[in-house]
From Swiss-Prot:
Protein's name in the database: Toll-interacting protein
Keyword Zinc attributed: no
Major site of localization recorded for this protein: cytoplasm
SMART domains associated with the record: C2, CUE
Subunit structure: Interacts with ATG8 family proteins (via AIM motifs), and ubiquitin (via CUE domain). Found in a complex with TOM1; interacts (via N-terminus) with TOM1 (via GAT domain); the interactions leads to TOM1-recruitment to endosomes and inhibition of TOLLIP binding to PtdIns(3)P.
Function: Component of the signaling pathway of IL-1 and Toll-like receptors. Inhibits cell activation by microbial products. Connects the ubiquitin pathway to autophagy by functioning as a ubiquitin-ATG8 family adapter and thus mediating autophagic clearance of ubiquitin conjugates. The TOLLIP-dependent selective autophagy pathway plays an important role in clearance of cytotoxic polyQ proteins aggregates. In a complex with TOM1, recruits ubiquitin-conjugated proteins onto early endosomes. Binds to phosphatidylinositol 3-phosphate (PtdIns(3)P).
Record bears the keyword Mitochondrion: no
Entry-linked InterPro entries: C2_dom, C2_domain_sf, CUE, TOLIP_CUE, Tollip_C2, UBA-like_sf
Motif annotated as AIM1, chain positions: 133-136
One BP annotation, GO: autophagy
Domain writeup: Both ATG8-interaction motifs (AIM1 and AIM2) are required for the association with ATG8 family proteins.
Origin species: Salmo salar
Compartment(s) where it occurs, according to its Swiss-Prot or TrEMBL record: Cytoplasm; Endosome; Early endosome
Amino acid sequence: MSTTISTQRGQVYIGELPQDFLRITPTQQQQQVQLDAQAAQQLQYGGSLGTVGRLSITVVQAKLAKNYGMTRMDPYCRVRLGYAVYETPTAHNGAKNPRWNKVIQCTVPPGVDSFYLEIFDERAFSMDDRIAWTHVTIPEGLREGSVVDEWYSLSGRQGDDKEGMINLVMSYANMPAGMHMSPPVVLMPTVYQQGVGYVPIAGVPTVYNQGMVPMGMPAAPTVAAQEAPCSEEDLKALQDMFPNLDREVIRTVIEAQQGNKDAAINSLLQMTEEL
């Protein structure tokens, strides 16, 4: 029970203070903002709790409609899946026909069924120029163990689906409970502009490398990821059988089939029939 006494400086409390002393009750909007922030952090940093599988995206090559600028373009790709952003190396002097053959391993949060892909021209003395973009829906057949090798239309200055095409090879693997993947991701604030898409807000992006945990987030136990066995002997044998397919594409298929050579051959045969 608290009592009040008067002093030269005014009234003061003596004894127990009320539970809401010096506390400001948040409004409904503030509570919603806090809940949204917590949900975003769980998707962004959460390991096994929010992850349902691993999506492997091989960015093979692109055939663009136009070379913008006076010199040959230096294109690179940026993939945004959930709250994570991944980039390929720059294809220097790639111009209209850049080749990357970059394999990107992405964790897929619950409820995410698509990703956003952009192609930029790397500039030395100015902002990188965005050339093309597309929104890719993750094929349902991937969860059944198939490998998808498709060309996707790109939108850009030439118009919707008129900026060229990009070749992607995708596979999907379920992750055992407790497995935690923490590849380097680039976290960039974005804003949606009508007719343009998601555009990065000016500023320095925050990069979290493997092993780094943002302040205030619990450190998830690191479990070594069990990579599918892919021996050089099997890789060379399949490369001899399918000389028209890229080496990294064959490696991705073998890993997606958990090292099962017969299953990998069937998937590669299916891919060559579709080419």
